[in-house]
């Protein structure tokens, strides 16, 4: 397992509860840029729409050798999870006070994976 990027801010700002491993749908120039380590998870978050999971605001730098077919750096990317996992996350989010944050991006074999965690925000007052 080769770790590409970690979200250390999430460990500081949230109490992390449950961990899920999700595949991520990437374009050709995105995966080439990820292999070079040009990923930032700092301000990214996970959103669930119509029983599909998306990661938003995750920055993958444009590939240096990509021409007009290069990708948009902060586009919305679909995450690949089992239906049971999506339903479990959705039910816990409906209880309130929880969110889902990406904490780590890594390669499992040749596939890029994103570790997402169910989290509760910390109070600083």
Question: What residues fall within each predicted segment?
Answer:
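Arg/Lys-rich, often Gly-containing low-complexity segments of ribosomal proteins
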Residues: 5-10, 38-39, 65-82, 107, ...
């Amino acid at each position: 397992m080769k770790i590409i990027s970690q979200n250390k801010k999430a460990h500081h700002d949230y109490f992390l509860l449950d961990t899920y491993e999700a595949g991520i749908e990437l374009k050709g120039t995105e995966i080439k840029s990820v292999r070079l380590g040009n990923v930032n998870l700092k301000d990214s978050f996970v959103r669930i729409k119509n029983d599909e999971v998306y990661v938003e605001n995750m920055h993958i730098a444009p590939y240096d050798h990509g021409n007009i077919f290069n990708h948009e750096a902060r586009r919305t990317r679909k995450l690949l999870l089992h239906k049971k996992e999506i339903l479990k996350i959705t039910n816990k989010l409906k209880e309130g006070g929880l969110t889902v944050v990406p904490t780590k991006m890594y390669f499992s074999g040749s596939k890029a994976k994103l570790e997402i965690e169910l989290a509760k925000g910390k109070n600083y007052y």
